[in-house]
Amino acid sequence: MISVATAECFTHGKIGTKIHKIACGYKEFEKDSNYDMIHGNVYVMASMFLPSKKGIESLLDVNLPKPDYVFKYSKAYNQENDILVAKLVAKALKNKLNCNIAISSTAGIGNGAVCIVTDYNDYVFSSDIYGDLLKGQNIIKRQESGIEKAYNTFIDILKKEYNLK
């Protein structure tokens, strides 16, 4: 079984929740074209929504850079630092839980960043939607784009790296 863990911010834990529901056989996902590939082959060790720097650092024993922007209790970075933070979080999660696949997401101002670290490779990409957390601009559309791209990349990884069909 392939173990998966997520530490998500702008995707609100929805990547891990979707994978978990399919892996566990939730009926609402039986029509997903990848249901048979995930169900019985994948399990989710943890799926976390972690919007705060303190929460991430405390749970994953990682030091993150100072946020670029002040936003309530949450961290907010520019695009360049979102990419850096996504990498740091995914690698820390993989090391902490010793899972096969670790997925992280973060987004402040920009397209956000998703990082998937596997036993073999690191993948870093952004959503297709620019958003601004401080202004509340396009954050739902950015989230939806990030979730879709992360799930599709996860499926590609299962096929290419873990030979699932």
Curated annotation (Swiss-Prot):
Q: What family, per the record?
A: Belongs to the UPF0254 family.
HAMAP family (alphabetical): UPF0254
**UniProt-listed InterPro entries:** HcgF
Q: What's the name of the protein?
A: UPF0254 protein MMP0935
